[in-house]
């Protein structure tokens, strides 16, 4: 049963993380629940043996680490890495146009997606929007769970 629970937790994480920004927010909520301490990347850190810490950059990447009770020169250290983004299509800024009752969004390929898997199926939008509010740039996570888009597959002779 433990293996099934681990798989279910992973699937829940993947489903809840449609963008790097969502993934980092999900990871941060787990870290806070187990008493990790967030550090400011630009500040001098006060670290303690056995401490559990993390740093977030641009809300799209996260680094976490746990200090042992001995100095790394005595006990060594381990590093594990992963990335929170995945291949896909990203909406270009100011890339929206419309004509004949249809809206079109300019997109750019990010990473190395298998493009055929995006064609002729319902798609939606998730990510981070940035906007100006009272002379401040603010960011907000967005996720639309209903189908909004479709990329038509053109006939091979087109």
What are these regions (language model features)?
Residues 1-158:
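N-terminal hydrophobic/helix-forming segments and targeting peptides
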